[in-house]
Amino acid sequence: MLMKCLPAAILITGLSYIFLIPEEPLIIKILFKVLPMLLILLYARTNVGRRGRYQSLILLGLFFCMLGDGLLIWFVFGLSAFLIGHLFYISAFFGQWNFSWLRFATILPISIYSTWISREIVHSLIEKGEHNLIIPVICYVTVISLMGWAALMTGNAAAIIGGLLFMISDSILSWNKFIDDVAFSGPLIMLTYYAAQFCIANSIRRKPSFHVSKGLKSERLIQ
């Protein structure tokens, strides 16, 4: 029963934070930002599927990302928490390595993209005189790019979608924060972020949480 209710609760609390909660008071804003992540963490904990090391690493990743949500008002501390969370995700995904030349080759476009966006951000930071952020930002872009590629290498649809959505979310956030304003950046960042974390939590399942009927084959996640 709990597993059936949690996705709806995650959706409701996530949309409430994005569209209803005001910027002030800040403590209320932070609490509502963390609440969907707490529910996603609970969802991952009660998920029946890859028990053991994979689930433990995903849970640790979710926890540090939730911590990052609360600390992001102190940017470097929040960024550090997210970086640690991604390291746990990377470890979990590489533990589910499922080699394919096609998936392996995605390292090239991901590397090109991460190099390009890193250069754009660094150029902007230099112009603004924020040299102290250059190394942390480069480290973070490198780690999240590796996380996205590691997710692709699992062959797990939920992990892949989650990893790519996370990259999209952080790309919008980085561009908006360091380079130029992005229209509707707030909703876009958080919608893709919560969706990414939910998909990563759902990757614990051994079977997909949905199926396609009426002439279409049910999707099977590659283990």
Q: What residue spans do the PLM features occupy?
A:
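Polytopic alpha-helical membrane-helix bundles and their juxtamembrane interface segments
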Residues: 1-223
